[in-house]
């Protein structure tokens, strides 16, 4: 059964409660694996899914134009890192903008309704926003802009208990992933 989550911490909590056995996490949740809350069993890829997206109708045509604007972000995510790198590239910091804490679904709604001027989020939200705003959507920065500075790994994880009891399942799962990528 496939279950969708808003982020890695929620996935790891669902594993800890026994609701799911395996999950795929992005960059930020790897810290929880380092803390021992989950076990990485398959490195998936490096992510290029994050972006800072702005609405040009809000007077934003460059990263520098974010100064004084309201930006939706989910703290602790790789998208927030991209936002910080983008701001820095224009000589700005988070102190120069108004940040609004929001999950990915909220960002889509806020961008479409005009409730925020820009957002830092990942796919598929970036695509949904671009489709909804059309020509008014402007991607200001992505992971690709900073690959020489930071890498965002994605991995498949499980609990230590599931890994110990189901080694063969994890091997078959990993082999299936590799075969699908071939």
Where are these regions (language model features)?
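Short helix-loop capping/hinge motifs at secondary-structure junctions, enriched
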Residues: 56-65, 92-94, 161-170
